[in-house]
Structures are given as C-alpha cells and as structure tokens.
Amino acid sequence: GLGDVYKRQIIDSCGELLDEWKKDEHFESVALTLNVGGESIIDDETFDQADFLKKVAASPECPKSACPSPERYMKAFDCDADHIYAVTLSAELSGSYNSAVLGRNLLEEEKPGRKIHIFNSKSASIGQTLIGMKIQECEEAGYSFEKVIETVDEYIAGQHTFFVLDNLETLRKNGRLSKVKALVASALKIKPVMGSTDEGNICQLDQARGINKALVKMAGQIAEKTQNSEEKVLAISHCNCHERAILLKNALQEKMPLKNIVVLDTAGVSSMYANDGGVIVAV
C-alpha cells in the first residue's frame, strides 16, 4: 500500500495510463484536446481510437492538438495529497509543461505551501508512463519528496524514446520535425527510425526499406543505446497494430535482457501523432 502519506500523480493524456491506474484515485489524466475536421475530441476515457482514425482518414486537413489550460492543471493540483507530481509531454514538443508550471503557480498564490513537482518527461506516450511507474516505485519505497524528485530526474536523464511510423505527416505538418535533418522520401517506402534527443526533441537514428525492417533496425538501436538493460522496464505503445508491437517485442527479447516489457495501445494524442500503424518504445 501507499502508507499514510497521500500521493497524487497527474499525467497529461499523451501518457498512456496502465489499467490499474485507471481505477486508482492516486492517478489522474489531464486531457489534451484533439481537433480533426472541425470537431473537438477530448482525449479522456471516452476516446475511441477506431472512430478517431476513421475521422482522420476522412478529413482533408491534418489533425491538431491543444494542451490543457493552466486552470485545468490548477484544478488537478488542488487536492489533499501531501506529494503531488505531474508528468508532461516534452516541453520541446508541447505547451503542456508550461501550462502545468503556470497552474502550480496559480495554486501557490491562492493556497501556498503545497508540495507539487512537475516533471518534463522530455518524451511522450509510454515514456511518460514509465516515468509514472518510477514515481510510484519511489513513493512505495517510502522516499522523501526531494529524493523522489532526484531519483526520477536521474531516470529521465537516462531514458530514451524511439519510434517507427507508417506516416510522419501529422508530426511534420504540426512542425514537430523542424529540427530533424535527414528525412527521406516516403515514395521509396523508406521508413525512418526516429528517436529522442537529450533535450526532448525528435531526431532520426536510422532508416530501412519497409516498416518491418525498420522495426528490426529500431530494436538494434534500442539494444545499442540501453545500458544495464536487465534492470530496466521497456514499454511499447502501438496505434492499431498489435502484431507489429509483438514482432518488435520478440526482436528485442532476442537482442537484450530486460526486466519486463509492457505493451499498451496509444491513447488519443499518441494516436494522433503516431498515426495508424505507428509503434513507439521507451526504456
């Protein structure tokens, strides 16, 4: 159990929630809003991935996302918990982190003295999920608020995110690939293997002809970049392509020892950016 000290974790909705978190009052998802074809879709437990992908396919415009307001974060932080943590999308990719900081400042003016810490994941999707798992592990071990922050900051500094997408257009059209040097023509069926930089931007690591070869190359990149892998939990999220996720899981298990592998479906924001057929990994 979590002992007497009451904790709260707030994760923006780009971060996939584990099934047990969905039923746990210690966890709350703060929703981003998705806009597709003039319709606003709240990325909460009502999100319907199949319906969303259908709408994206039918819409001539590229979908967009809007981050939660500072007031929404303020409301989430305004609770009786002794320790409150937020885990946001990379500040390089979204305004969610800044919104959370503003929300904390607003609450501090009205009700000073709360212990609230906001982690910039420098990642997205299941990168945020793994950070949430690390916070939970530290809290369950009885760490002080300061020690949790220190340990999780270290974890974030050592975490890497990787992805292979069938379709990079949503990222590209929303300006999320502006820092990427070498993107290749999709006409050649070349699929880039993408990754995260230390600051939380997106970079290209490799490429292959066809998505299955790209997944195998990604597995190689992950094995190469992961130290002490036998002590680490690796997470995979996929957008409507379970068989690809399993292909990748098997490739990873052949290449490296891991403590555990978690496989989740992408929620709303991750589905929007990964697109149908995309696979994301964090470790």
Task: Describe the predicted segments one by one.
Residues 68-84, 88-111:
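Active-site cofactor/cluster-binding pocket
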Residues 13-35, 93-96, 100-105, 115-117, ...:
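Mixed-charge interfacial surface used for oligomerization/domain docking
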Residues 7, 84-86, 232-234:
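Generic beta-sheet signal
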